């Protein structure tokens, strides 16, 4: 029973990976130019923020005005922490730590910050390219209008700030736009959205921010099936995700050690 289930799972993952590549590649010359423009623009801003301010890489590990705890946690932690709001985000910390170890010899200063900001830049820039592709392939407007709308989105204050914000939001930005494009392409080509596709996207989006797991599942209501069939399919899709999160949370709970808070006690002089 178990081998057959694993075989079905791996086959589904192969199919979804193939569809993922079809959704992301190949880029057109306009998309390549759009990517390079925003990547370089955001890169210059991120470089300035990292090396000429103390907003991102706060000295002495003190909480700064720029997102305080959240930014410091995602920039400096070596992984191993579990947050129920971001159940699979520890994978990012693990990969970031490995890259930091590998690249420390090349970048003597602020290695972790460079890696994090480069990844955030790639996610936001990639999300903008997918917005352009959605406007062209799904909405089917002219290239000029698609570029205008994409450029307008790329200049939003929120988008610019996310390009140098080491947080879960850039991941969600990219994955939600990617999910919209992938689901729209499937519905446009077949007139039906498979539960397998929604399960795949729910794991991706929900793994970064747990509430995002339900967003791809909303596409079930586009299928021309009875209402209760949609509800049953939605439950079947959400159940594996919930079980997986519960197992991971249980693992971290059992592994966790009691934390001593004595080191948080401030000297009397600091309270005056």
Tell me the role of every PLM-derived stretch:
Residues 1-46:
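Start-transfer (signal-anchor) and selected internal transmembrane alpha helices
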Residues 89, 93-100, 116-130, 172-175:
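Transmembrane alpha-helices of multi-pass, membrane-embedded glycan-processing enzymes
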Residues 193-224, 240-241:
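Membrane-interface alpha helices of multi-pass inner-membrane proteins
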Residues 171-189:
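Specific aromatic-rich, kink-prone transmembrane helix
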Residues 131-155:
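Transmembrane-helix signature of polytopic, membrane-embedded enzymes
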């Amino acid at each position: 029973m178990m081998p057959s289930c694993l075989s079905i799972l791996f086959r589904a993952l192969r199919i979804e990976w193939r569809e993922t590549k079809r959704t992301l590649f190949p880029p057109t010359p306009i998309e390549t130019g759009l990517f390079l423009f925003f990547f370089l623009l955001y890169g210059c801003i991120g470089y300035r923020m990292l090396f000429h301010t103390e907003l991102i890489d706060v000295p002495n590990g003190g909480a700064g005005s720029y997102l305080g705890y959240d930014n410091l946690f995602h920039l400096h932690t070596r992984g191993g922490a579990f947050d129920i709001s971001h159940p699979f985000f520890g994978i990012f910390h693990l990969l970031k730590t490995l890259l930091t170890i590998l690249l420390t010899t090349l970048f003597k200063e602020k290695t972790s910050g460079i890696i994090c900001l480069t990844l955030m830049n790639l996610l936001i820039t990639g999300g903008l390219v997918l917005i352009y592709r959605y406007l062209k392939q799904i909405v089917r407007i002219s290239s000029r209008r698609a570029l205008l709308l994409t450029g307008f989105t790329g200049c939003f204050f929120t988008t610019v700030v996310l390009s140098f914000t080491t947080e879960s939001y850039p991941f969600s930005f990219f994955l939600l736009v990617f999910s919209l494009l992938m689901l729209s392409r499937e519905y446009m080509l077949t007139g039906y959205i498979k539960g397998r596709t929604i399960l795949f996207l729910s794991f991706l989006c929900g793994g970064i921010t747990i509430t995002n797991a339900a967003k791809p599942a909303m596409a079930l209501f586009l299928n021309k099936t009875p209402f209760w069939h949609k509800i049953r399919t939605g439950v079947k899709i959400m159940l594996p995700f919930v079980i997986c999160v519960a197992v991971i949370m249980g693992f971290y709970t059992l592994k966790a050690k009691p934390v001593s808070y004595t080191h948080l006690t401030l000297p009397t002089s600091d309270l005056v």
